[in-house]
């Protein structure tokens, strides 16, 4: 794989199946938007790697699938991936575990809609999901303002002072931890400075 910015070669691990019970850390990375991210060692650009994803949670009987549109995967390729993922998961389940829900996984057009469904299954309301998205957006805008200078940052902080609360700082802390986990120390440092 080559960096789209500087064309330097890079290596990255790609996750295509998440079993929430066996790998809760992958579920956390998915929810934080850090799944299948790579960092170019040459220019430092963060790269989102497009890959199909099969999400499974046996306790909640969830089977979700997402194919990024940019993959242009044919229907037969999608069905083959889903069949292979389903077979792999079924073999890992205990003999008496329910399996019917795996035969018709719910498909999602966007990764964000899949993440929303995971959060809803965890009991997170639509309102909380939207509030989280707004916090994430604000964090991104504050990071951009910080790069432009102290004046731009101060103006944006004043404008959104009521949104900068404990939940906001918890979101920043989660992003710092996720950034460190995937080796994005520059991003973690920027967020620490922002905090």
PLM regions with names:
Residues 1, 8, 33-36:
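Short metal-coordination and nucleic-acid-contact micro-motifs, chiefly zinc-binding Cys/His arrays
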Residues 158, 185-193:
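Short, charged, amphipathic alpha-helical segments
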Residues 22-37, 55:
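Short linker/helix segments within small regulatory modules
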Residues 42-119:
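Domain-exit/linker segments immediately C-terminal to small folded modules
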Residues 3-6, 40-43:
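Short cysteine-rich clusters marking metal-coordination/redox-active sites
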Residues 147-153, 180-188:
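Charged, low-complexity interaction regions
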Residues 161-173:
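Short amphipathic alpha-helical heptad-repeat segments
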Residues 9-13, 49-50:
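Short, non-ligating residues that shape and space the ligands of small metal-coordination modules
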